[in-house]
Structures are given as structure tokens and as C-alpha cells.
């Protein structure tokens, strides 16, 4: 029952957050906006990036101008999230082991990734029997993803990043 609720909420909230916090430059909602939302709603939040300046555009994933505009928009939400208590980290080696460790610490993980040429985010709920339990707003069922699948997903053209969320009681 728990997972059926998570799936439904995942899709509902994705649409809600996209309406409220949508990017002015890319399709979807910046994770920094979600970090701000969760932080101001009294959840413990960590926003982690592999790159020293949040993202890189060395692969020319976006035009230079679009990258600059998108990065500035992202940074504005980062400031807001940090102001209300989110912990923001840059230059972190985001690995499968780190994800497993954070799941063991009772965090839910919103993991950014890339599917073909599109950036996308999934919710990782747990790690059990050598698989990650993944809620993807594009599907209506819990998916089991291997370490390899998650590792491939999270390596994007602009870096790796994730949002960790849990109740403050931990």
C-alpha cells in the first residue's frame, strides 16, 4: 500500500511543483526549487553536486547563453533553500555507495539523470536485494534498478546532482 501511495503522490507532486516552480529556460522544475520547497516546509534537506560550480557545460549540452541563464535561475533557488536551512554541497563524489549510505540514513533521494538527451529526475525510496526501488513520474509502478542502471542514469552531460530529504527527527 505504501508504494502505491508513493507512486500516486510522486506524479501529483511533480505536476504541482512544475506549475509552481517551473524553470523559465528548461522543461521541468530545478532541484534547487524543490530543495527550497522542502526546506521551508521543515524537512531536512541536502542538495549535493559533483561539480565545483554546480554544473559544467564543457560538453556544450546547452548554448552558452542558455546555460548561464539556467545556472543563474538555479542559483537563486539555491540561495532561497540555503536561507531556510538546506545544506548545499559542491564538488562531492556522488557514487552508488553514497546513495546507499544516504538511504540507510533514512533519506529519500531525488536523483537527477539523463535519458538520451533529456534531463530527468527519479525518486529512490530504498535499496534492497541489490536493487534500488525507484519511483519514476513517467511510469505508474515501482521499478527495480541495478547499481549499473543508476550509475549510467546519474552521469549527465552537465554533472551529477541529487536532493536528499528526510524528517528532521533523525
PLM region spans:
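Active-site nucleophile-adjacent alpha helix/oxyanion-hole segment immediately C-terminal to the catalytic cysteine
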Residues: 1-48, 97-101
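Internal catalytic-core helix/loop-beta-alpha segment
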Residues: 68-111
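Short gly/ser-rich anion-binding loops that grip negatively charged ligand groups
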Residues: 24-28, 64, 89
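Short His-Asn-centered micro-motif
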Residues: 28, 49, 91-92, 111-114, ...
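Low-complexity, serine/threonine/proline-enriched polar segments
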Residues: 41-46, 50-86
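Noncatalytic regulatory segments and standalone regulatory/sensor domains
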Residues: 101-108, 112-170
Amino acid at each position: 500500500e505504501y508504494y502505491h501511495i508513493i507512486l500516486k503522490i510522486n506524479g501529483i507532486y511533480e505536476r504541482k511543483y512544475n506549475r509552481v516552480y517551473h524553470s523559465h529556460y528548461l522543461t521541468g522544475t530545478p532541484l534547487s526549487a524543490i530543495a527550497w520547497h522542502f526546506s521551508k516546509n521543515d524537512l531536512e534537506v541536502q542538495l549535493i553536486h559533483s561539480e565545483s560550480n554546480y554544473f559544467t557545460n564543457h560538453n556544450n549540452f546547452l548554448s552558452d547563453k542558455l546555460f548561464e541563464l539556467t545556472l543563474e535561475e538555479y542559483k537563486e533557488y539555491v540561495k532561497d533553500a540555503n536561507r531556510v536551512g538546506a545544506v548545499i554541497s559542491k564538488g562531492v563524489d556522488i557514487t552508488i555507495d553514497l546513495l546507499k549510505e544516504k538511504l540507510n540514513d533514512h533519506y529519500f533521494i531525488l536523483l537527477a539523470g539523463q535519458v538520451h538527451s533529456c534531463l530527468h529526475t527519479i525518486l529512490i525510496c530504498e535499496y534492497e536485494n541489490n536493487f534500488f526501488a525507484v519511483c519514476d513520474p513517467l511510469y505508474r509502478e515501482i521499478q527495480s534498478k541495478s547499481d549499473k542502471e543508476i550509475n549510467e542514469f546519474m552521469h549527465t552531460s552537465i554533472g551529477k546532482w541529487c536532493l536528499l530529504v528526510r524528517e528532521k527527527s533523525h
